[in-house]
Amino acid sequence: MQSINLTDHFLIAMPGLEDSFFARTLTYICEHSERGALGLVVNRPTDLSVENLLLQLGMFPKGTASSNLPVLLGGPVQIDSGFVLHEPVGSWKFTLSSNESIGLTSSADILQAVADCEGPKRMLIALGYSGWAAGQLEQELAQNAWLTVPAESQILFELSSEERLPAAMKLLGIDFCNLSSEVGHA
């Protein structure tokens, strides 16, 4: 099988995907290699706001720029841990660069910077992440569980969580309502 790298791509869940957690999700792939893949679901908001998350962590927001943003449920792995997808990459303690401008940070220094109004210009904060073991994502792709498309930062950072999946589908020229898990023959 030919090696593919889906870092900085969107995964769009197909209607037939059997995992209920990922039904109707848009996942941003932060890293994909022969060791596996790591991503964040970017269209599953929680009831928790960034402001409330910061307060729960003992950080007192000095401004309101991002305080009303919803915290996302990034995936079923480590749901008690926070992950910040942001632009620009910056120089935070634990950052994984997905491309030249987008990073994923898991250290508390970025959250303190957000509370101090010194955080990244554009960001999403998620609890948990989505992970795949070596070869697992490739197997799911072969089973038609996902559509893939190169990611666009405008979709991540300028649209609401509800608008992200339809916008990613539009990149492929597809309306989600027209997708089916059934195959027919003429």
UniProtKB/Swiss-Prot annotation:
Sorted alphabetically, which InterPro entries does this protein's record hold? AlgH-like (IPR003774)
Highest taxon, organism lineage: Bacteria
Any one GO CC term of this protein is: cytosol
Task: Identify the Pfam families for this entry.
Answer: DUF179
Write down the SUPFAM superfamilies for this protein, in alphabetical order. Answer: VC0467-like
Q: Which Gene3D superfamilies match?
A: VC0467-like (3.40.1740.10)
> According to the UniProt entry, where is the signal peptide?
none
Matching entries from NCBIfam families are given as: PRK00228.1-1 (NF001266)
HAMAP family named among the record's database cross-references: UPF0301
The record's comment on protein family reads: Belongs to the UPF0301 (AlgH) family.
- Which PANTHER family does the UniProt record give? UNCHARACTERIZED PROTEIN YQGE, UPF0301 PROTEIN YQGE
Tell me the protein's name: UPF0301 protein NE1668
- Per the UniProt record, the source organism is Nitrosomonas europaea (strain ATCC 19718 / CIP 103999 / KCTC 2705 / NBRC 14298)
